A protein has these predicted regions:
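Alpha-helical membrane-interface segments at transmembrane helix boundaries
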Residues: 356-364, 426-430, 434, 470, ...
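Membrane-interface amphipathic helices and adjacent TM-edge segments
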Residues: 5, 310, 381-447, 491-522, ...
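Hydrophobic core segments of alpha-helical transmembrane domains in multi-pass membrane proteins
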Residues: 486-487, 527-536
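Core hydrophobic alpha-helical membrane-spanning segments
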Residues: 11-23, 447-450, 484-489, 515-516
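Membrane-protein biogenesis/insertion across secretory and organellar systems
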Residues: 1-381, 553-586
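Transmembrane helix interruption/hinge and helix-loop junction motifs
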Residues: 365-367, 519-529
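Conserved catalytic motifs of ABC-family nucleotide-binding domains
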Residues: 449-490
Length: 586
């Protein structure tokens, strides 16, 4: 039947959209740069604040040409190089190591059981937001250039440690006729790191100051069935007007510049290292991606600087190094919230995350897997009226199948008339030919939005469902139990759906699509698979309930007129009337 074929084509199109939609709408999961493997930083030899000598730094790599506009020029005859010193700050949230080499941040290690990479493996380690191979541009590396482009202070300037305490450290250097002091301060109440830069020059300065951040990245990895395990690393710049740009290794255009910027830094999907300009000071940003197979990602935030002869200038930069938790970002600065990229499905994703947060907060045992199950139940309750209407329409479609077949035979040579009569029949019986597709059309945006939520929301990072089985809802099911169970429930759902599938090949195709969809889910987040599996279970229960509720009432025998064929009645010895009809009452 034509309507059946149309429904089949629509169903196939929808399933294909499900299969390819994740990769169409979210290419960055497969195409983004991958962070280099983390190395465990050495624990401080002393208490939270240390000033320990370190071995001489090796030669600076090609990435030392950060901020390409600020060319590195000879510095003349340098004075004695001060010893390399490090200072360690430790708060309840982070362990920060500052180095005198360039007066930059050498390590930002997030503390707590949640903040680990490769959890449950031999490579498990605390998350460090500074790449061990980012020596070309450690966070808060500073470059000062004059109006002629000459570098007055370079990225590799050697600083001396002047003073330090439990939450701050000051480094100082003299180079190119400029005295520069950099004071780092950490706040135990949040993930903020502030940097106060003080410049002095006997002959004055007119130019610009750039704060740099870099990381090592590799070329995009993975394919169609790539595991959901990579951690993308990209440079990021909030260029104003809610325009946030990101740049990864392998980008078509390896350089991005914006004349205005609210912050710039390194975005690792769940984590952010960024710096913001001083209040009221205009800033620009520049993002760079060096290398083809692997290389450096460098972000720079540049502000104008003006120092009168014999005078000084102070600039206070606010930085952030931590998880992209909305409340934590807002505690430091509101613009940082723009780093949370929920993409095309942002409105739905924010709603889903809000519902899950509510369930996680109020329902014991405060488990994100349970929150996903309750989210599924809530969505099912909200869509129940539509599901009810859809199933009623499908059951009515089954009941009028004989009439549709008669119309098909009657108007076999007139397709236009056949379609017209079918539509009249649908209208007469309140049947919507597309009714069976509506529930799935509603679920698809939820699937895509939930996938993006799992991909971005740090609340779900390393969030377990059942210990020993699913330790991270943002990663695949390590034992593939959920994808297999999901495939079985999808087949059961098709069996119970009252769709007119008289053609065996159509049923076979439906089962094959369920199997292929399960195969697709093998490498996708277990949280998404848990949602679809729970939705299938609820759909099975709902269909069983609606089949009983919408079951047509039995035909009553009382008062029914039965037509009796006169010839058959005569042969059986009955006494038929002249009209050949008899009324039989129960």
């Amino acid at each position: 039947m034509k309507s059946q074929n149309q429904n089949l084509l629509v169903a196939v199109a929808i399933w294909l959209a499900c299969m390819f939609g994740l990769y169409l709408f979210f290419p960055e999961r497969i195409g983004a740069g991958k962070r280099a493997p983390q190395q465990k930083p050495e624990a401080p030899a002393q208490a939270p604040v240390t000033t320990a000598p370190a071995p001489p730094a090796g030669p600076v790599g090609s990435g030392a040409t950060v901020a390409s506009k600020a060319a590195d020029v000879p510095r003349g005859t340098p004075g004695p190089k001060p010893p390399l010193r490090t200072v360690t700050f430790e708060t309840p949230r982070v362990r920060v190591v500052a180095t005198s080499e360039g007066a930059a941040i050498q390590s930002v290690q997030l503390l707590g059981e949640k903040w680990t990479r490769h959890k449950g493996t031999k490579e498990e380690s605390q998350i460090d937001l500074v790449s061990p191979r980012a020596s070309e541009a450690l966070p808060f590396t500073t470059v000062v250039t004059g109006t002629d482009g000459k570098a007055l202070v370079t990225a590799t300037t050697a600083y001396a440690l002047v003073k330090s305490d439990a939450t701050s450290a000051t480094f100082r250097a003299e180079e190119g006729g400029v005295t520069i002091s950099k004071t780092f301060s950490v706040n135990p109440e949040h993930y903020g790191i502030s940097l106060l830069v003080e410049l002095k020059a006997a002959q004055g300065i007119s130019g610009q100051l750039s704060i740099l951040s870099g990381t090592h990245a590799e070329e995009p990895q993975g394919g169609f069935f790539a595991p959901h395990t990579s951690t993308p690393a990209r440079t990021i710049c909030a260029a104003g007007n809610n325009n946030v740009e990101r740049l990864a290794i392998g980008a078509k255009h390896p350089v991005f510049e914006a004349p205005s910027a609210q912050f710039a830094g390194i975005d690792e999907e769940y984590f952010l290292s960024a710096v913001m300009p001083p209040a009221g000071v205009p800033a620009s940003c520049r993002l760079e991606a060096h290398g083809e197979k692997s290389g450096s990602l460098i972000a720079s935030l540049t502000v104008p600087v003006q120092v009168a002869a014999g005078g000084d200038s102070q600039l206070l930069f606010q930085g952030y190094a931590g998880p992209k938790d909305e409340s934590e970002l807002m505690a430091v600065a509101k613009p940082l919230k723009q780093s949370i990229d929920l993409g095309f499905w942002a409105v739905i994703a924010e709603l889903l995350l809000g519902i899950m947060k509510f369930f996680y907060r109020v329902v014991p045992p405060h488990n994100w897997g349970v929150a996903i199950i309750l989210l599924t139940l809530a969505m099912k309750v909200l869509t129940f009226p539509l599901q009810h209407k859809s199933m009623k329409s499908m059951q009515e479609m089954q009941r009028i199948q004989p009439q549709l077949e008669e119309l098909k035979k009657k108007y076999a040579g007139d397709t236009q008339r056949q379609n017209l009569e079918q539509m009249k029949l649908f209208k007469e019986h309140g049947v919507n030919p597309m009714g069976s597709c509506l529930p799935m059309l509603i679920q698809m945006p939820i699937w895509f939005a939930l996938y993006k939520t799992l991909q971005v929301s740090v609340e779900l990072y390393n969030a377990h469902f059942i210990r020993g089985w699913i330790e991270d809802l943002t990663s695949k099911d390590p034992y593939y139990i959920l994808p297999v169970a999901m495939g079985i429930t999808m087949i059961l759902t098709q069996v119970l759906t009252p769709a007119p599938m008289s053609n065996p090949s159509q049923k076979t195709m439906g089962y094959a699509m369920s199997g292929f969809f399960s195969l697709l889910m093998l490498t996708l987040p277990s949280g998404l698979t848990l949602y679809i599996f729970t939705n299938n279970i609820l759909s099975i229960a709902q269909q069983m309930y609606l089949r009983r509720k919408l079951r047509p009432p039995p035909v009553k025998a009382s008062g029914q007129t039965v037509e009796v064929d006169k010839k058959k009645d005569d042969r059986s010895g009955g006494s038929g009337g002249a009209s050949g009809r008899a009324k039989i009452r129960a």
